[in-house]
């Protein structure tokens, strides 16, 4: 039985079969874990293995017990600040010391070691035998049981004397029972450049050598950055390469996919894929106030316990309303909850905010999420393409299991969110996940130089850059601690010389294991940052006289490229032409706002309302300014609107409501419409809104009193013909005539002053017309109430210091003009003609304005049509 062994072997290794069949019979490639597992099987030993997160949690439990018994110690302050993170660091120290055969002796050497020794008493009761213990037991049992190893041949890349002492003892024990230990053969020497450099490195000779510039056995390919390297290497066939070495193969796989070539298999390192955040996002729902971004992110997970149709509708409702705890969302949940009450109760936040978090609720959530993740992973595992998702779902289940153990250490009925967040920041950390699975016919790729088992004819080593040194064993120890442990033989540390030689041998394995050609790929920058030179490159630059002869700067040639005609638009044409315009479906109604967009900016209307192409994501929450406006509208409606069967609200009634109910109305509106303002980063904005809104409502009430106005409605929906509008506030003056107020939360006060002065207030004039049609009475006054300035802008007269009247330049009936313009624009779009912001005089609409009685367009100083200040399409329509 051939055992190819190295502590570094894991995942894919490069090994060539001994014969032409391509089959490795009676051969296994193992690292230390694999070797111990195989020997345990033969020795009849079995131990339960815990995954790393579970070990961390158990160690945290042990540390909690120790800290309770010994509250004064050198690590107590760190543990109180971040217990789980401290426990994780302590466990890493403990494991590294155990690998040096420490048996928890030397309490008197340092206070830090004394804490580790004390915690170990509790930890051993929770987890039993650890990995170092298993290695020690197997080593003893090989000799005690006289395991027959006569047919065992152990092949290693380095001599056993260079291994860690604990591993070396295991190899010695196997050798004593008849196992044959061999060092794997290296590439044969020749007179090429590669052999010369190999001898230079092995002999550690000083002085310089000169290489044959016509010999291609050793080449250095330099690229500006990782993108250039991956693009070139994926584009080239390079079919004669036996093995590729690439520590981070993700970008290369992406390029191979773009080139239509088989992917080689890669991982995402130090990352947290979206699906693995299920537990983190779900636990974030327990935070108060509720983070609406977390809720939307939780509902948008690609795989979720709740069905996708419901989640999509709920997200849309949250975005439209500005929050979750409102009537619209409550009604939607109720509609879909039948038969799923428990599911909704567990995986959705409560509609009533609570100041406490019950441990039982958190435990139930974690348990149900774990069960669902395992079931979903099992169901998805039947299809190979779901491999990455299955891996991530099982990671979620493991995190849930670890978190449930943490909850078991918490004895109180309630738990604060800071504790939950602290635990999750440690458990839900970054890890390695599958990016792509190797496809048939792909290149042979290994992720580390040390994983070359067989001699290769041609090797490409990508990433010969950066610091290659390894951290020394137990490097976290203070010199005094290490000296004390070594002097008293409490640890059997790796000899520094042997450790250095071992890492150097393994790091330079491509040099020893390549016979024909070795290509070293160097990237000068990674992620925009300059990289350190690899020790091998430094050595070559110092000792190779003609180093420039073997350095190449490859680029992709221009041959084979398809010529592409350059598209250049020096200026925007007056009109764009749209094919198949007859297929456009118009909405069944327009609003005063969309009418303005259609008439003045038809390109924007086409993109946003007909083609539904917008810059906002479907689940993008409104910004702070918009949220302030929503809250203000909701508070005004709550306090000013008529109640019950009353036809109107009088100023005196409103004054009492404001005095008694403002705080409650504000809190309710904030929860329902302005959840984004409750986030920590927006607290100053929220406090400012509270003060500004109260001031604005006081001014609004004063205006009602001074002008003898009473409120007849808020958020009044009216539909006249094919125009649908929602009027913010309808009022009635002392003569019984209707009045309209439209509320704006904006700092763009100059814009509203201009549209009133120029008689271009489309929204107000349409509201005037619609209310007149509805009530069969003339609406003599309409106005904008501008917040937070608390000013009333109108063309008509109102009494009060905060009321400003603007005299219009003309008294045109703009509603009739707009009606004609709507018909004109619809006809244009139906014929595929889309007006842009071209030269003003070139626009057909401008030419027809007077003749056809159209609503006039504005002209800017550059001689073109004035653009939309709020446009999302400036890239297309300048």
Task: Report the location of each language-model feature.
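Helicase P-loop NTPase motor core
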Residues: 1-12, 142, 192-261, 284-290
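Conserved helicase core region in the C-terminal RecA-like lobe
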Residues: 5-9, 18-19, 26-35, 153-159, ...
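Basic/charged alpha-beta structural segments of nucleotide/phosphate-handling enzymes
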Residues: 9-149, 160-165, 309-345
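ATPase/helicase motor core of nucleic-acid motors
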Residues: 20-29, 34-38, 43-44, 234-349, ...
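Accessory C-terminal helicase-associated subdomains
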Residues: 150-152, 334-448, 632, 637-710, ...
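Accessory/regulatory regions of helicases
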Residues: 218, 459, 465-589, 795-844, ...
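Conserved C-terminal motor-coupling region of P-loop helicases
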Residues: 314-332, 385-547, 745-747, 751-754
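RecB-family 4Fe-4S metal-dependent nuclease core
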Residues: 570-878
